[in-house]
């Protein structure tokens, strides 16, 4: 059955190549893959051992000669070779090369990246087997993915908070009118929790533990009956395992600085928005997408600080890849929002 689905010649795909997760959308099928953007490498021969979920399970648990690497940092490629290997693995996983022509590939990129960084993404796609590579800015993809009328002469505003970046953009007539891209996302929140626990409790947390704490009891706004959680790490003084109880209010204090940076980016963008478009946004609301949209109370925090209505996307984790996929499904209409170096 899988072969029959992917054997159509030139089955095109859209890829949300995120710092935390990679999602793949195949034209005519939908989302077919959602895995962590992690590669486990044997440093003795530079050979990838595992990619995706299996590689993520290895983070912090590998012998010295095996490294679990996240090849993207802050939304851009930090390790080109490893990114290419990861892309090739994901493409091969969903695309039958023996029966299919090479696909056209659309890859999402942060709105604030340089031309060199954008070109690196395209090159990684070509090296991984693309016939033609396109890029689309993440806030535009997110807006399309949540069904905002991006081609109309009215303002729509999206806040897409991913693992490495937060993208804030006002869109009208198929273009980004005002945008702000900051290299702060879910990873920064995890790091803030690690730093805070280290400072307050003399305890070191692992990356995965910090992420689990954020998802379980993290919040950007106070609420009733706030929970607490047992957290295990390593005592920095004795070097022995240690367990503490963290409250939701403590985690909120830990992540306050990066959360405020996100709020400031939204306020900056609103301040630069033309009055007519600002009026449209007041009617329609600011749409939250990305994994950060799942942070409890972020909508309340933004509503309080901006005075604007806040709407959380129905499928915040999939919004960007769904919008990129829509560009393939309706290429004649939406293809104008894509960029390409033009390499054949």
What are these regions (language model features)?
Residues 1-161, 169-287, 293-344:
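Nucleotide/phosphate-binding catalytic cleft detector across ATP-hydrolyzing
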